[in-house]
């Protein structure tokens, strides 16, 4: 409603029509809000009902499993439930035992791998110690020109196999010759290693004996000299 005068270009009939239109718009807006609220309430009810359904189904299944069905005696049903519980407990224990066995097998594998890695390392250290003495005494050997080279029986057999074009036999004999030469080198290196070790032990024992001997101090030496001089007085 207009208080006072109307604006220019408007009549009372126009003002009444405008007020009626505003009222209808307000009523329609209220109706829309009410419809939206009703829809939201319905959606929440549907969601609650859907969430409650699986719980009720699971509970009903559990109750149906625990309850004795019709036509079966109660004693038999109780025995069946006890057997079912024992079976489930056995499954759980077997699964735990398998897990422990797997852990043990993994630990055993790791131990074996560590042992395998440690063994080659010790062998490698021993081999390095021996390789230091390879060819140590070669300088004492006479030169090749003055040496009377005499072929061994194995070398003669290799030459014979080569002349007969028997390559496989020649390769086998050459491998045997190489292993023999390597064995000789290793034996010489071991002898040198043992000699050096024994020499070091003797030197260390001599040094320890020298340390045990009491060294003459300046004052002790002076006293000894004075005592010896007093004997001649």
UniProtKB/Swiss-Prot annotation:
Q: Does the keyword Coiled coil apply?
A: yes
Name the domain of life this protein comes from: Eukaryota
- Coiled-coil residues: 144-164
Task: Name the residue ranges with Basic and acidic residues bias.
Answer: 39-58
Q: Where is this region: Disordered?
A: 1-126
Basic residues bias (residue ranges)? 97-109
Q: Where is the composition biased (Acidic residues)?
A: 13-24
Record keywords: Coiled coil
On whether Magnesium is a keyword of this UniProt record, the answer is no
- Put simply, this protein is called Protein FAM204A
What does the organism's lineage look like at the top?
Eukaryota, Metazoa, Chordata, Craniata, Vertebrata
């Amino acid at each position: 409603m207009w208080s006072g005068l109307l604006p220019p270009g408007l009549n009372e009939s126009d003002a009444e029509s405008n007020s009626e239109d505003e009222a209808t718009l307000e009523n329609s807006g209220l109706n829309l809000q009410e419809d939206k609220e009703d829809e939201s309430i319905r959606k929440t009810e549907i969601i609650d009902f859907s969430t409650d359904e699986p719980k009720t189904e699971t509970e009903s299944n559990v109750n149906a499993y625990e309850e004795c069905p019709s036509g079966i005696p109660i004693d038999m049903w109780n025995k069946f439930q006890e057997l079912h519980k024992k079976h489930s407990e056995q499954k759980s224990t077997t699964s735990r035992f398998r897990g422990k066995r797997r852990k043990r097998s993994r630990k055993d594998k790791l131990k074996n791998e560590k042992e395998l890695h440690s063994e080659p390392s010790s062998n490698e250290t021993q081999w390095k110690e021996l390789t230091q003495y390879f060819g140590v005494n070669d300088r004492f050997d006479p030169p090749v020109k003055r040496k009377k080279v005499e072929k061994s029986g194995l070398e003669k057999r290799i030459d014979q196999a080569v002349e007969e074009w028997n390559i496989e036999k020649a390769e086998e004999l050459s491998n045997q010759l190489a292993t023999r030469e390597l064995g000789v080198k290793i034996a010489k290196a071991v002898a040198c290693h043992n000699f050096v070790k024994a020499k070091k032990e003797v030197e260390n024992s001599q040094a320890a004996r020298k340390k045990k001997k009491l060294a003459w101090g300046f004052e002790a030496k002076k006293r000894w000299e004075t005592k010896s001089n007093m004997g001649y007085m």
